[in-house]
Amino acid sequence: MTKIFIHLGAPKAASSSFQYFFHFNEKINFLGIIRDHHKYKFSKEYNSDFHSYCRHKNNYYNKAKKIKKKLLKNKINLISDEDFFTSQFANFKKKIQRIIKIFPNCEFIVVLRHPIETIRSWHDFDLRRFQGTPIDIIQYLKLNHKEITIDLLNYKKRINYFKKLKKNKFHIIDFNVVKKKQIIQILEKIFNTKLYTEEKNNIFE
């Protein structure tokens, strides 16, 4: 059986760095998207139908499941999209169920950052990007469109949900290991294989 891993983010937990690493690593068949805030970069195997279906932007199951044809037996198959972990467009549970419908035995990977650090990161980002963003972080969190961000920080709810899945492994990575540059060893343990890395392509160094 060909293994498939789903990297869920979380947002503001080095997701773009992970996606760049997955994209350039020779041992990984990367089927995801790099969201780097400047522009999206797609892997050549990227399947927009799968991502849109799982995010509940459409109901085209037959198109979405064609992504299975892009799996490789001799590589680590990996899909990444941090929106799968959020409740934007649809509740995160519904998104995960759509993923499982296509990949019943997939393994999930999530990187969790301290909630306060995550909020500060979102706030700093929005201050740079959006004119009129409140400088006061309490006022910032009271904005209507920040309900999704606040919900995202309910890690306990999400962890409890994933633990109840019977056929799917759930790997949690502490964001601190990324900061300590220990992430390659963690990923190798999850994938159960040595990852080929070149200095120029190892964005974690």
Language-model-derived ranges and their functions:
Residues M1-F85, C106, I184-E205:
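PAPS-dependent sulfotransferase catalytic core
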Residues T2, I28, I172-D174, T197-N202:
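A broadly tuned "polar low-complexity/structure-edge" signature
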Residues G9, G32, G132, N201-N202:
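Residue-identity detector for glycine
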Residues K66-K69, K73, K94, K164, ...:
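Intrinsic low-complexity, intrinsically disordered segments enriched in polar/basic residues
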Residues A90-E198:
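PAPS-dependent sulfotransferase catalytic domain
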